């Protein structure tokens, strides 16, 4: 059972809208909790409950619907920029390359934003290995280069995080009007104002698990994930599940296989 409670709005309609938003927040955080927030933009929400173990609440129908929705958004965008959190781990990197492949399925250029000054050792080793794959390496650009290339109708996809302050480049984030979020962390207070689509599933082991499911609904004989991309996404799942010892469900094993 989840509840969203709001109070103090100037109108009943605004208070009701805030209450619905609070309920949505409770659900994307995993459910079994109550979210209370005053109907003011600057107000901070209060969270009660949510202590139970997260169970698998998403369905294949929802995953397919999300895949088709993202496909439509990509088709309406000039190009795609993909950004993870600061000091990205393998899940952020793997899911970013997965989204880039989704963009290529739909004949759109995709760029993965990385800051060379914020690279952890595991990711650094992968970036060395990726030099053997020019098509993949050329997708990686700096925040500064991304700001030069961005067009008015460009799309930003946030992977493995949803708090703008955790962006590799918050300045770059603020340049985008079109934003999509793919994340597996419980939704917090800080959140983009008006994302085009928010796919947050706290029951998933990782962002790579979610992106793999999205790819499954768009791949065919002509559109396939490359072996190195699949390896990066599997590494993201392995890291976030501590080698399948935590936050692992039947769907995690299904995706990994």
Provide a role label for each language-model segment:
Residues 46-77:
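Positively charged, low-complexity intrinsically disordered leader regions
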Residues 7, 38, 114-115:
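Residue-level recognition of beta-strand->loop/alpha-helix junctions
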Residues 85-86, 116, 159-162, 182-185, ...:
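Fold-independent oxyanion-binding glycine-rich loops
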Residues 64-67, 74-88, 95-108, 189-257:
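A structured phosphate/pyrophosphate-recognition subdomain
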Residues 139-194:
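Active-site cofactor/cluster-binding pocket
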Residues 1-2, 6-7, 157:
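Alpha-helical/coil-rich non-catalytic "connector" segments in signaling and regulatory proteins
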Residues 77, 81-152:
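Anionic-ligand anchoring segments at beta-strand to alpha-helix junctions in alpha/beta enzyme folds, i.e.
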Residues 2-4, 17-46:
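Catalytic/regulatory signature loops of cyclic-dinucleotide turnover enzymes
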């Amino acid at each position: 059972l989840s509840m969203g409670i709001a109070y103090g709005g100037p109108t009943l309609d605004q208070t009701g809208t805030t209450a619905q938003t609070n309920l949505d927040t409770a659900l994307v955080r995993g459910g079994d909790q109550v979210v209370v927030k005053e109907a003011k933009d600057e107000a901070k929400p209060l969270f009660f409950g949510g202590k139970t173990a997260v169970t698998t609440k998403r369905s294949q129908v929802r995953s397919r619907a999300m895949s088709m929705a993202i496909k439509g958004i990509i088709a309406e965008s000039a190009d795609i920029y993909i950004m993870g959190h600061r000091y990205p781990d393998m899940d952020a990197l793997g899911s970013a390359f997965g989204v880039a492949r989704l963009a290529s399925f739909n004949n759109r250029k995709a760029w993965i934003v990385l800051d060379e000054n914020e690279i952890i050792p595991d990711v650094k080793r992968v970036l060395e290995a990726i030099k053997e794959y020019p098509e993949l390496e050329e997708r990686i650009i700096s925040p500064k280069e991304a700001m030069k290339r961005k067009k008015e109708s460009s799309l930003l996809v946030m992977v493995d995080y949803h708090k703008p302050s955790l962006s590799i480049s918050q300045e770059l984030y603020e340049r985008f009007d079109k934003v999509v979020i793919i994340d597996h962390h419980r939704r917090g207070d800080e959140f983009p104002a008006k994302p085009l689509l928010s796919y947050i599933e706290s029951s998933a082991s990782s962002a790579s698990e979610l992106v793999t499911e999205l790819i499954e609904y768009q791949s065919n004989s002509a559109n396939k994930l490359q072996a190195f991309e699949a390896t990066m996404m599997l590494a993201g799942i392995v890291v976030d599940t501590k080698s399948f010892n935590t936050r692992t469900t039947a769907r995690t094993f299904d995706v990994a296989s």
